[in-house]
Amino acid sequence: MNSRNMKPFYHLLCIIARPLLKAFFKFQVFGIENVPSAGGVMLMINHASYLDPIVIGGSVNRNLYYMAKSTLFSPWFIKRFLISLNAFPVRLGSPDRGAIKRAIQILNEGNLLLIFPEGTRSIDGTLGKAQDGVGFIAHRTNTAVVPVFVDGTRAAWPRGSKFIKSAKVTVSYGKPIDMSIYRSSEASRETYSKIGEAVMAGIADLKHERELLKKGSR
């Protein structure tokens, strides 16, 4: 991967973030070779903390775009900061056609898009169900779909906490999901649901592998 096409401010933040992540969180990345170095890629990640986009951005060397709930885009200086981080707003609770259209555009332009298939942060770390919009986007674009599991961010910055604390954080990238069977199927809610199930199964497998490694290191 290369950083030639990164926005200057975004590139600078990544340069700053990486050593800080390693120092403060004992940051480790596994399976980064599973992320294609070019072309549109959907990174499907469990959502545990507001730190998640930061640790993903610090582990890849490409421009990373991601959705963030629309309520975060105020006041204006927060909005400008989020936009500088390649974030774009999405309304939760109902299908947001504008956000979906933007996501498809980003992928068709050959970019890396971070998606939280569950739609919101987990309260207790358990994995939930993928939103149908995830399957729709994956079905409509000829892009790689990579499951990702992040571990430790919930301990570092749990939901409801105002403060960040030191914790071991790891990111595990799985192999791209074989999408051929789904993309050859008709566009339907059933197909989108099956894609979502495959995505969450991929994340669950990575979570299980991580838990086994943690038990083995004790």
Protein language model regions, located:
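Catalytic core of membrane glycerolipid acyltransferases/transacylases, capturing the structured
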Residues: 9, 14-15, 22-23, 35-94, ...
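Short gly/ser/thr-rich secondary-structure transition/capping motifs
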Residues: 22-30, 94, 154-155
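Generic structural signal for residues in well-ordered beta-strands
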Residues: 27-29, 87, 145, 171
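Short, flexible active-site-adjacent loop segments at beta-strand->alpha-helix junctions, enriched
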Residues: 33, 47-48, 55, 60, ...
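A short beta-turn/loop motif at secondary-structure boundaries
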Residues: 33-36, 164
